[in-house]
Amino acid sequence: IAVYPEHAKRVSVFHNLINWNRIRSKAEQKGGFTDGYTGMRLLTVGRLIREKALELSVQAMKLLKDEGIQARWYVLGEGEARASLRRLIRKLGLEQDFLLLGSTDNPYPYYKQADIYVHASRHEGKSIAIQEAMYLGCPVVLSHCSGNREQNTNGVEGVMCDLSAKSIAEHVKMLIQDESLRKNCSHAAAARIQASEENVEMLLKICDQE
């Protein structure tokens, strides 16, 4: 647009057009957590790679456990960091507290059943996982990076944390202990993403005009 301002009216931007009806339907299917845990469930979805900084989430879970916070953290995804993460989990004695569940064809029941979604990564674009979590009503804890900041207003749909185990733990603890904040963020997160469903209608209108 800066180079060809005369074409500005012909340009529209659409981020991650997603079939929300499909996600809504799949979230209602059988699946999700099977361990019978009744405490607070934390969820992260993504590849097990350095960029996702999951070692900090493991360390954050240790801090939460040491403070007596009742929670269990689940991660959906696979990647090259699995072995190192498992070693760290064993070293910190978190085998029953931080669970690597692997990949699944249908993550949506997990989103729906989770209490808090955590996405504390080193770098992020426009994360589909964050959008899906928010759509299904998860309050979010996100690290301060450009892609995450675009998807969350701090204190509205969730909370923003620094990229450190201490900060992640503090912000997760904040949502766990403040039920009112957690519920308000849940409603706001779903409302924000549901409003974006209009993008599909806009795209169809543009296609009809061509």
Positions of the model-derived regions?
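A short, well-ordered alpha-helix in the C-terminal region of glycosyltransferases
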Residues: L181-A195, M202
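Short hydrophobic beta-strand element within catalytic cores of glycosyltransferases
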Residues: P139-L142
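Nucleotide-activated donor-binding/catalytic signature segment of Leloir-type glycosyltransferases, i.e.
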Residues: R86-G102
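Short acidic/histidine- and often glycine-rich active-site loop of Leloir-type glycosyltransferases
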Residues: E132, C145-G155, V159-M160
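Carbohydrate-associated surface elements
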Residues: L17
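Conserved acidic donor-binding segment of nucleotide-sugar-dependent glycosyltransferases
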Residues: N154-A165, M174-E179
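A conserved mid-protein helix/loop that constitutes part of the nucleotide-sugar donor-binding site
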Residues: M40-L63, E80-R87
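Aromatic "clamp/platform" in nucleotide-sugar-dependent glycosyltransferases that forms part
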Residues: S103, R122
